[in-house]
Regions:
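Generic recognition of well-ordered alpha-helical segments
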Residues: 25, 50-61, 75, 79, ...
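Conserved beta-strand positions that form and line the central face of beta-propeller blades
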Residues: 7, 18-19, 28, 44, ...
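C-terminal cap/loop subdomain of S1 sulfatases and analogous C-terminal strand-loop tails that border
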Residues: 6-10, 52-55, 60-135, 139, ...
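Short, solvent-exposed loop/helix junctions and linker helices
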Residues: 23, 45-52, 70, 113, ...
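Histidine-centered active-site microenvironments of extracellular/periplasmic hydrolases
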Residues: 1-40, 50
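Active-site rim elements
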Residues: 15, 37-48, 61-67, 115, ...
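Long, internal low-complexity/basic segments
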Residues: 149-201
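Intrinsically disordered, low-complexity polar regions and short flexible loop motifs
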Residues: 142
Length: 201
């Protein structure tokens, strides 16, 4: 696999960047010699996978504990085993910091504001560049992403739904990496821990 695709002239662009399928949809080939993978060997998996799923997969493959309070992704081992994973992710997320790009200078955008986000499910792709109107693409009717529905009144509801989904994904990021939820919520006497009152308001 790779961390990005390549336009190769599609959309009159080269290289990577932006959020068209040519850039963000990247094939991944997994060869797992384990016997448990025989069930899915030679098959294609169409469910959403993100680069952040790789590290949890590697840790799971060598039976090392996965620090779920630190890692955003999901292990792919259940998919390789052919397990029924009904609660698998229903969307993928991507973001870009284009502070070093020429586009930032042309648009006269501050370095901290040169950020963009994308969220995609099976039907829709929603893109938001900070400081600009959102973009929306109907991936069923417009798989090549030529018709931006970002200002379409008819699609205002789906735009709002995708915006909420994007916001939820950003809000749900794992920011507290030093302690698990179990550790934080464990009942204890704050007045006795090392004689220091921590977390008491």
């Amino acid at each position: 696999t790779s961390d990005h695709g390549d336009y190769q002239g599609d959309h009159w662009l080269g290289e990577k960047e932006l959020f068209h399928e040519q850039s963000v949809r990247v094939p991944m080939i997994i060869y797992d010699p384990s016997e448990y993978a025989n069930k899915t060997r030679g098959t294609k998996e169409q469910r959403f996978i993100e680069a952040i799923d790789l590290l949890p997969t590697f840790l799971d493959a060598v039976e090392s504990p996965v620090s779920k309070h630190r890692l955003e992704g999901n292990s792919l081992i259940p998919l390789l085993k052919g397990e029924n994973t009904k609660d698998w992710k229903e969307f993928v997320f991507s973001e870009i910091d284009y502070a070093f790009n020429e586009a930032r200078k042309i648009l006269n955008i501050g370095a901290s504001d040169a950020r963009a986000f994308m969220i995609r499910n099976n039907d829709w792709k929603y893109i938001y560049y900070k400081g600009f109107e959102p973009q929306l693409f109907d991936l069923k009717k417009d798989p090549d992403e030529f018709n931006d529905l970002g200002k379409s009144e008819e699609h205002s509801k789906i735009r709002e739904e995708m915006k909420e989904l994007l916001l939820k994904r950003i809000i749900d990021r794992k920011n507290r990496v030093a302690a698990t939820d179990e550790f934080v919520t464990k009942e204890r006497d704050y007045t006795k821990d090392d004689g220091i009152m921590i977390g008491v308001w």
